[in-house]
Amino acid sequence: MFSPGQEEHCAPNKEPVKYGELVVLGYNGALPNGDRGRRKSRFALYKRPKANGVKPSTVHVISTPQASKAISCKGQHSISYTLSRNQTVVVEYTHDKDTDMFQVGRSTESPIDFVVTDTISGSQNTDEAQITQSTISRFACRIVCDRNEPYTARIFAAGFDSSKNIFLGEKAAKWKNPDGHMDGLTTNGVLVMHPRGGFTEESQPGVWREISVCGDVYTLRETRSAQQRGKLVESETNVLQDGSLIDLCGATLLWRTADGLFHTPTQKHIEALRQEINAARPQCPVGLNTLAFPSINRKEVVEEKQPWAYLSCGHVHGYHNWGHRSDTEANERECPMCRTVGPYVPLWLGCEAGFYVDAGPPTHAFTPCGHVCSEKSAKYWSQIPLPHGTHAFHAACPFCATQLVGEQNCIKLIFQGPID
């Protein structure tokens, strides 16, 4: 379920060097149909046996398509900026022995290290629930890591295709900077948000920015694919921090550094917390039957002993089929303990350890999905505005991508028995 070596946090300097991990928001530890090859919910970036990074070198200004094609066919990496039918700027890239490059995108072609497809909220991302038209770029972005300490990771919009080229056509937003070098934006953009205070219990949301093809930082465009770029933010960089969020317009990724993962609870810790709750034998206050969180191996079917909760008040019960207040709102129930009316849902333990900002007990549930995690983690994600569509932002559950609702977006759970 997790990347090799995740549990071996005790030796962060052990070879091979891990730069960090990318975790896709909306999945609770694995893809619904299982992690396969380069398509998975979590991807570890390790130092490569041999550097594969590239850096800009020669710039060509070309007036004919044939000349442009001749340069792009030389076998070197290049970025082409088409200014008009009669003018293209081609920037050649040469080998960089000091960096490793990792590429992310929707394409399954070999240059892509981590294949990402559109996330469907509620984790209904199955073969039956296909996106009709993806908004994620086939070659969405690239992450370049320094091979020497402190192993800095930087993000750039767009990735090189199978011909080692990046093409920015006539309609793409592109420009020449005052220092003379060309730059541009991809169609739907690559957005990044660095949390203030790192990825800890005290973290606060940062500001969403757009990253250019050359790695500069800009304010957001008016809409996702607008022609006019935002304003250059000279005080910020494209260096990824622990907890940085990367949005590819269809999927959002969380970047965790190797050091950050070293201080993150492991799957074993979350399993121990689950067993601790179950060992306390919480009871349904009405039926007095014992409740138990199901095993971490994710199941679609709700189990008989699974705890349910009224999300308006937080009271935890076993399942019962009464308390409906109306036929139109099938999920609205009246809590028998306090008479509060609201959603009544099964509770699922949040199993993806990378989303936790602390190692606290699972005491809070997101509304309306019922995923449970620590108080600090629930409150952190409840205040993070995640991009949705082409210009909207809203908070969402990191474990299933469901849009959050309610006053606080999460609720403290009230268990009957010795837990509280």
UniProtKB/Swiss-Prot annotation:
It catalyses: S-ubiquitinyl-[E2 ubiquitin-conjugating enzyme]-L-cysteine + [acceptor protein]-L-lysine = [E2 ubiquitin-conjugating enzyme]-L-cysteine + N(6)-ubiquitinyl-[acceptor protein]-L-lysine. It holds the Pfam family Pellino_FHA. Changing residue 397 to A: Loss of IRAK1-polyubiquitination. Coiled coil: none annotated. GO terms for molecular function: ubiquitin protein ligase activity; ubiquitin-ubiquitin ligase activity. Pathway: Protein modification; protein ubiquitination. InterPro entries: Pellino_fam (IPR006800), Pellino_FHA (IPR048334), Pellino_RING (IPR048335). GO terms for biological process: positive regulation of canonical NF-kappaB signal transduction; positive regulation of MAPK cascade; positive regulation of protein phosphorylation; protein polyubiquitination; regulation of Toll signaling pathway. Changing residue 187 to A: Abolishes binding to IRAK1. GO terms for cellular component: cytosol. It comes from the Eukaryota. Keywords: Phosphoprotein, Transferase, Ubl conjugation pathway. Disulfide bonds: none annotated. Phosphorylated by IRAK1 and IRAK4 enhancing its E3 ligase activity. Its EC number is 2.3.2.27. E3 ubiquitin ligase catalyzing the covalent attachment of ubiquitin moieties onto substrate proteins. Involved in the TLR and IL-1 signaling pathways via interaction with the complex containing IRAK kinases and TRAF6. Mediates IL1B-induced IRAK1 'Lys-63'-linked polyubiquitination and possibly 'Lys-48'-linked ubiquitination. May be important for LPS- and IL1B-induced MAP3K7-dependent, but not MAP3K3-dependent, NF-kappa-B activation. Can activate the MAP (mitogen activated protein) kinase pathway leading to activation of ELK1. The atypical FHA domain contains a 'wing' insert and mediates binding to threonine-phosphorylated IRAK1. Belongs to the pellino family. Interacts with TRAF6, IRAK1, IRAK4 and MAP3K7. Interacts with BCL10; this interaction is impaired by SOCS3. This is E3 ubiquitin-protein ligase pellino homolog 2.
